A protein has these predicted regions:
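Short, solvent-exposed beta-strand-terminating loops
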Residues: 163-170
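An active-site-proximal "capping" alpha-helix that borders the catalytic cofactor pocket
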Residues: 48-59
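Active-site beta->alpha N-cap acidic-glycine motif
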Residues: 1-34, 83
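Short low-complexity, flexible loop/linker segments enriched in glycine and/or proline
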Residues: 25-28, 51-53, 82, 103-107
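Acidic-and-aromatic substrate-binding clefts and catalytic sites of carbohydrate-active enzymes
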Residues: 10-22, 41-48, 69-76, 96-101
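Active-site-adjacent pocket scaffolds in enzyme catalytic domains
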Residues: 58-59, 63-161
């Protein structure tokens, strides 16, 4: 589907998954897509995993790994992300999700923090309605499209994310 529409994407992969699905990761890379880090494991995180996952993905792909996204879009220590060698972090969802996080005080669009480019997930202007996978699956398609286009026109880009399991029948 991406190739048909000439769309390039970033695939944030845990190193553990990549090491168990090497051929898939290399096929994604051959399609011209970026491979970025989603940590070593999705279920647990240690600061050492920042560097460890980056190195494992770089060894597998033979390419630099520049991006990081924390599992569950939880906050990370920017200084540690920078020290591990990442150029950008896409872990911020600049909205309020009760019981999860409140990032209403953070910028809605890209910004620099502690030497790392921050690429937040897109949220609508004004009310900061999150336009991530959950909205995509639960809003009427026409409404999601209108909100996404409004955000794209306002911000000059649109950044959303999906998980591989969303494209399979479970």
């Amino acid at each position: 589907c991406l190739a048909r529409h000439r769309v390039k994407a970033t695939f944030f992969c845990t190193a553990n998954f990549a090491l168990h699905a090497k051929d898939l990761i290399l096929d994604i890379q051959k399609g011209g897509h970026e491979i970025a880090s989603h940590g070593f494991y999705h279920s647990s995180f240690e600061t050492a995993d920042l560097r460890k996952s980056k190195e494992a993905l770089e060894e597998l792909t033979g390419q630099p790994v520049n991006g990081f996204r924390m599992a569950r879009m939880m906050p990370g220590e920017e200084e540690e992300i920078h020290k591990a060698g990442y150029l950008y972090n896409s872990s911020l969802n600049p909205t309020c999700i009760p019981g999860r996080y409140n990032h209403l005080g953070q910028p809605r669009t890209y910004f620099m923090k502690d030497g790392v480019l921050q690429l937040p997930a897109s949220v609508t202007p004004i009310v900061r309605f999150p336009l991530f996978w959950l909205a995509y699956h639960n809003l009427p398609a026409s409404l999601y499209r209108k909100l996404a286009l409004w955000t794209w026109k306002e911000d000059g880009y649109f950044l959303t994310y999906f998980h591989p399991w969303e494209f399979t029948s479970l």
